């Protein structure tokens, strides 16, 4: 799992991509409107003009995606240590987490030693079993 700052950076990158995709969609699919009554109707033979209702629905979806990403970013920002958390408190928390990590690492090392001991014991039992079968076949 990544840390909160990395998650925040990823979300900001995703939001930037969403903005670009939305602007690209608008640019490629918008209808043409006259600015004044006397102005001729503009058109672009390369543009794909989407029906107004479909265009509006797609814009609503894209806007909703951007809003959801904004909420996700705000939630990540809120989870970061705030201005109210002093440097000493942050250092104490880091020390506590480091001690906890050392304890967990010690437990892991003990578990690995126990596993290796059990594996040697199982290997010994298997060898004794195989030797017993081999000896019983020799005697018959």
Curated annotation (Swiss-Prot):
It is found in: Nucleus. GO terms for biological process: negative regulation of transcription by RNA polymerase II; positive regulation of transcription by RNA polymerase II; positive regulation of transcription elongation by RNA polymerase II; positive regulation of transcription initiation by RNA polymerase II; regulation of transcription by RNA polymerase II; RNA polymerase II preinitiation complex assembly. One of its GO terms (molecular function) is transcription coactivator activity. The keyword Lipoprotein does not apply. Keywords: Activator, Coiled coil, Nucleus, Transcription, Transcription regulation. InterPro entries: Med7/Med21-like, Mediator_Med21. Pfam families: Med21 (PF11221). Present with 1391 molecules/cell in log phase SD medium. Component of the Mediator complex, which is composed of at least 21 subunits that form three structurally distinct submodules. The Mediator head module contains MED6, MED8, MED11, SRB4/MED17, SRB5/MED18, ROX3/MED19, SRB2/MED20 and SRB6/MED22, the middle module contains MED1, MED4, NUT1/MED5, MED7, CSE2/MED9, NUT2/MED10, SRB7/MED21 and SOH1/MED31, and the tail module contains MED2, PGD1/MED3, RGR1/MED14, GAL11/MED15 and SIN4/MED16. The head and the middle modules interact directly with RNA polymerase II, whereas the elongated tail module interacts with gene-specific regulatory proteins. Residues 85-125 form a coiled coil. One of its GO terms (cellular component) is core mediator complex. Component of the Mediator complex, a coactivator involved in the regulated transcription of nearly all RNA polymerase II-dependent genes. Mediator functions as a bridge to convey information from gene-specific regulatory proteins to the basal RNA polymerase II transcription machinery. The Mediator complex, having a compact conformation in its free form, is recruited to promoters by direct interactions with regulatory proteins and serves for the assembly of a functional preinitiation complex with RNA polymerase II and the general transcription factors. Belongs to the Mediator complex subunit 21 family. SUPFAM superfamilies: Mediator hinge subcomplex-like. Gene3D superfamilies: Mediator complex, subunit Med21. This is Mediator of RNA polymerase II transcription subunit 21. It comes from the Eukaryota.
